[in-house]
Amino acid sequence: MSQSIPFRQAAFIIVILAVVQFIIQVSLLTKGMEYAAVSLIIDDTYYYLQTAWNAKLLGFVTFDGLHATNGVQLLWFVIIFLLAKLAKTKAILLFTTLAVSFLLNGLCYLFILRIAAVLKQPILALFMASLWTLQSLPFRIYSMGMENSLHALVFWCVIWQSTVFLIRVQNRDKPNFWGLTVVLILNAWTRLDSALLSTVLFTFCVGMLAYTYRHNLRLFFQSHSKAITGSSFLAGFGLIAQLTAFRLMGDSLLPVSALIKTSDAVQGSNIESIDKLVEILILGMPSILHGRFPTPILVLLGISGILLVILAGVSIRDHSDEIRAFLNLWSCLLLGEAIYHVYVALSGVEYSPYFIWYRSPSFIFWIITGSLIALFTFEHIKLVMHSINFHKWAPVGCSLIIFAVAIYVFARSINFTSKLYAARYDAALWIAENSPPDTVFASWNAGQLGFFSNRTFINLDGLINNVDYYERVLKGSVPLADYLVENKVDYIVDYSIYHSIPDYPVVRTFPLNDETGRSIHIWQVSSQLSSAP
């Protein structure tokens, strides 16, 4: 495939996209704390912020200041803990975390450029960069301070290292096992469930290497057994280090959040599994499509996109060696996505409430898919149109149009306000002003309340509590009312009750002022209503 624009020109445009996006997202911080609290940050973000802050002050990993916890993703928590060590106030920690997230979004363009440089495809770089802008700029998933931005950066790096590895294999050069292994370890450290994708990618890369020696496997083992063994030991060390860190933080090898999210995993019916598979497929597609098309259309779009890439890969004979290697990697990503989706669908894990925010690998897969389709379409048009200006400016124009759409969607969503978050923010400030410092609260959604109230808030959904609570209350027979009395809880604060509790009196209400008619209630806990003697 011939190139139509110099790589330097494409790189300049992509750097502009990255800088403009970073400036736009950082400008959100000028709107102040209340805007960040009610328009950007989800409740789970405060689980990281409050836990890192308490770890700094108390010397152990705890959200509520009472119970040790490991309900975090390792790499993002380490980063926020380091930020907490540097921050003088919780407000500075919050804004710094958001700024780091925005910086990570921008750094993704660096690895997009590295991928395109290896592939010698500046046009592909333009398409991938503009589609990444459309995903990461207008939608809150990459401006909420969670590990999504870090995961995206790490996964783009995984794509880069995997591409380099496969191209070197294809050229019969010595592949870099160590670079690939390190980024795959970081991928698992960023999201524990991404260990599955890391395993699939490493196995695929080794398999492709072995395939080149298919006529002399003995030479394959002689040449690469030490590197494969060393990489496997390094990966094992990375896993042991991760599990050891979780064990030291909170008395279990797996994070308590992972135990809870998978505790109800059971074999569902075939119909339920198919419905869930469709749900997961759609949730992993680009956010710009969500809510704009009915489910059958989205499924058809996804299947059609995959088939188009497969058809182009098979039918177009003049692919460069680099693009062929990239298509092999795309096939591996497709396999990894399929395995992950089928596992979640068949296991019965509740995907929507727990995993809905953590879809960076899926987003990146679809960005690559769309970019390959755009590249192949452009190359086909070039065969029938011989205008030099078209060859040079059409990809640039397309990428800038996509960028303009991203800014337009961002501008329309900038004034979004969650009435739930606003009411919870007001409740937290009221608690800070109207309760003694030693008051103990509890909530199923404790993040925002605990962070802004500066009071002890025990997490009742268990995701950022300790393993003892999971084993005794959530999975065991200890009534929640007894646990509340045992931990000297004075009040429960939430907009909904997720476990059976006695008829505690409501002492304060904060209406959400939405169509649901819900309110955040403050219940006063009474020891007389527990079953404890």
Give, region by region, the residue ranges found by the protein language model.
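Membrane-embedded, lumen/periplasm-facing catalytic core of multi-pass transferases
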Residues: 31-37, 401-450, 456-497, 512-533
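Membrane-lumen/periplasm interface segments of multi-pass, membrane-embedded glycan/lipid transferases
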Residues: 38, 49-51, 55-72, 247-317, ...
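Hydrophobic/aromatic-rich transmembrane helices and adjacent perimembrane loops
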Residues: 150, 190-192, 196-199, 295-299, ...
